Amino acid sequence: MLDYELYLTYYEWGNLKLKLKEWNIEYTIDNQNTEGIDITIKATPVKAKKVFDYIKWLYI
């Protein structure tokens, strides 16, 4: 498993956090501010692609 660092808006995070639990992907919250949230996920490349594709899907 690899670590992937993500900077997300609260909109993205609100939608993604339930999916991370559903997909059994571990994450840690590194930093939060008024604009967004930094997280690190521990995932295989296949699961990481699933996460990135889901974030893209939020904006379609």
Q: Over which residues does each language-model region extend?
A:
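Short amphipathic alpha-helices in soluble, non-transmembrane regions
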Residues: 19-22, 50-59
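Positively charged, small/polar-rich N-terminal and surface patches that mediate targeting and assembly
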Residues: 38-45, 58
